[in-house]
């Protein structure tokens, strides 16, 4: 699995669970071969440099025991430098989103997620006319790129870069409104994006500073410029596209009880929302709020909604390249360097050119993958929505992700998911087999001969049957075992395995190569991995 480390004073296990579920859908939507993961650190704001270093070192050691199932990256409260600390402690391949000197890419500085949002907008301009087959969109008019107006809520790594990419990639398009924590700016003819981006890079929040600078340089300020100290009032303005890019999941609702940024009946006129911010939650109550909002905004008002993990996966796509394009063996620092920052730095300096070339290779692959998959997501969303007038955008998005998970999992082979199976010598007794089954979570035992080859299997049912007919405890095991074994081979697909289990009405079977026992697959294992319910519909 892959997902970031969130470090906040109030982060909770429940929040981490919800975020991990969201990452599952995001990684699937990004067409990446990883499940969703997340981890959390409870820490106060304002840690000193040394305190932060010690926290990250300690957490790296805690995470290492899970290095074969979880790849950490940055999230709220952590950054690329923290990932470098983890890599120093645990090895280059045990963290993603590392700095360029380790072969990574500066994801926030490159605007990886923001780029995906603007790619989604570009694709929507082409695909949205198909929505006219739905009654709420029958009068939809899609502007040309040079006539496009956009509002952006939030001026962080996503919002600021989205504004810059919009003006660069879609010449003539205008960012007419932009908000941050201090307020919002609006001008119907477009804001000075380059100026605002430079302010953001230099000092962070832009709206108030730009407004105050404008008061002192009135002759250089466009007439009609509006500033409000209430950030949420940006949502009252009208534009073709609204991009939520602030760390607020609940930006709209029909009921003030959920504490949204704005009520639906108070927003301006929009035609599409592209969610740069993370808004998904598996929490049942939050999902009810979300569907309620979409019924009002999408179905009644005719505003298309491009769900967050369909469009903002650029960051995880960029990070994943550090695993998809492996670090060559000769660039991995020796194990004895782990934990020795000075030795690792010397190693990186000695191989700086090769790491730089590796970073460029990964960047090119990431940009290509991001552009292709996000355009595909938009096309698939529109396909689903126009085929079912009752479907909501969040339902379409979830269906796309789950469909990809199912496709990926169905391609897996038995050898990739099997678990160990206990074995017992054929010379054993029924009593010993019964004890072995009681002491093992496995529903079956593999019975092996003197050459350690499969001779049969014993199940709870075999033991129960032997007991019911009064068989003595010392009865040889070979007299009650099942000799005609239903088994899987390593190359069986998951669908093949499920078909065998269901056809023969068994709950488990060994995986064998020739007569050698490799492991076991059971219906319980498939259910634990959430495969069964995803794949049964395809049988």
Model-derived features: positions:
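The conserved cystathionine-beta-synthase
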Residues: 423-442, 448-449, 467, 487-506, ...
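A short, polar/charged loop-to-alpha-helix boundary motif
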Residues: 462-478, 525-539
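Bateman (tandem CBS) regulatory domains
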Residues: 412-422, 428, 473-485
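Glycine-rich phosphate/diphosphate-binding loop of Rossmann-like nucleotide-binding domains
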Residues: 108-237
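Rossmann-like adenosine-cofactor binding region
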Residues: 183-186, 191-305
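Adenosine-phosphate binding glycine-rich loop
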Residues: 266-409
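Short hydrophobic beta-strand motif reused across regulatory alpha/beta modules
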Residues: 455-461, 507, 518-526
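Glycine/serine-rich phosphate-binding loop and adjoining beta1-alpha1 elements at the start
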Residues: 7-8, 24-148
């Amino acid at each position: 699995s892959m997902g970031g480390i969130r470090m906040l004073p109030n982060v909770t296990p429940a929040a981490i669970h919800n975020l991990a579920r969201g990452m599952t859908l995001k990684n699937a939507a990004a067409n990446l071969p990883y499940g969703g993961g997340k981890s959390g650190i409870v820490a106060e704001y304002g840690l000193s440099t040394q305190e932060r270093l010690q926290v990250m070192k300690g957490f790296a050691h805690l995470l290492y025991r899970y290095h074969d199932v979880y790849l950490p990256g940055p999230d709220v409260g952590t950054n690329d430098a923290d990932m470098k600390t983890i890599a120093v402690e645990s090895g280059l391949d045990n963290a993603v989103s590392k700095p360029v000197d380790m072969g990574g890419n500066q994801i926030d500085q490159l605007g990886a997620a923001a780029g995906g949002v603007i790619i989604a907008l570009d694709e929507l301009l082409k695909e949205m006319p198909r929505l006219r087959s739905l009654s709420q969109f029958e009068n939809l008019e899609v502007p040309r790129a040079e006539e496009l107006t956009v509002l952006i809520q939030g001026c962080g790594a996503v919002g600021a870069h989205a504004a810059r990419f919009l003006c660069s990639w879609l010449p003539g398009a205008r960012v007419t409104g932009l908000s941050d924590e201090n307020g919002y700016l609006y001008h119907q003819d477009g804001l000075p994006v380059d100026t605002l981006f430079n302010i953001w890079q230099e000092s962070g929040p832009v709206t108030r500073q730009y407004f105050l600078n404008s008061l002192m340089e009135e002759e250089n300020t466009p007439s009609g410029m509006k500033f409000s100290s209430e950030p949420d009032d940006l949502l009252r303005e009208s534009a073709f596209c609204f991009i939520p890019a602030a760390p607020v999941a609940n930006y709209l609702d029909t009921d003030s009880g959920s504490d949204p940024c704005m009520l639906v009946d108070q927003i301006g006129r929009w035609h599409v929302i592209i969610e740069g911010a993370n808004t998904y939650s598996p929490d049942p109550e939050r999902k009810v709020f979300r569907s309620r909002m979409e019924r009002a905004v999408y179905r009644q008002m005719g505003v298309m909604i491009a769900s967050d993990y369909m469009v903002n996966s650029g960051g995880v796509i960029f990070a994943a390249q550090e695993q998809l394009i492996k670090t060559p063996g000769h660039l991995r620092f020796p194990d004895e360097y782990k934990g020795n920052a000075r030795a690792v730095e010397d190693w990186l300096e000695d191989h700086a050119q090769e790491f730089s070339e590796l970073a460029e290779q990964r960047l090119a692959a990431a940009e290509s993958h991001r552009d292709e998959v996000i355009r595909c997501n938009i096309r698939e969303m529109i396909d689903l929505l126009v085929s079912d007038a009752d479907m909501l955008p969040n339902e379409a998005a979830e269906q796309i992700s789950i469909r990809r998970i199912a496709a990926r999992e169905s391609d897996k082979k038995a050898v990739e998911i099997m678990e160990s199976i206990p074995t017992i010598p054929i010379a054993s007794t029924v009593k010993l087999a019964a004890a072995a089954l009681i002491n093992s979570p496995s529903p079956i035992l593999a019975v092996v001969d003197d050459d350690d080859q499969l001779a049969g299997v014993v199940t709870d049912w075999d033991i129960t049957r032997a007991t019911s007919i009064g068989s003595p405890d010392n009865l040889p095991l070979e007299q009650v075992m099942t000799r005609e074994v239903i088994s899987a081979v390593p190359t069986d697909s998951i669908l093949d395995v499920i078909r065998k289990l269901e056809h023969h009405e068994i709950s488990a079977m060994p995986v064998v190569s020739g007569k050698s026992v490799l492991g076991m697959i059971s219906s319980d294992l498939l259910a634990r991995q959430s495969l069964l319910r995803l794949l049964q519909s395809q049988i």
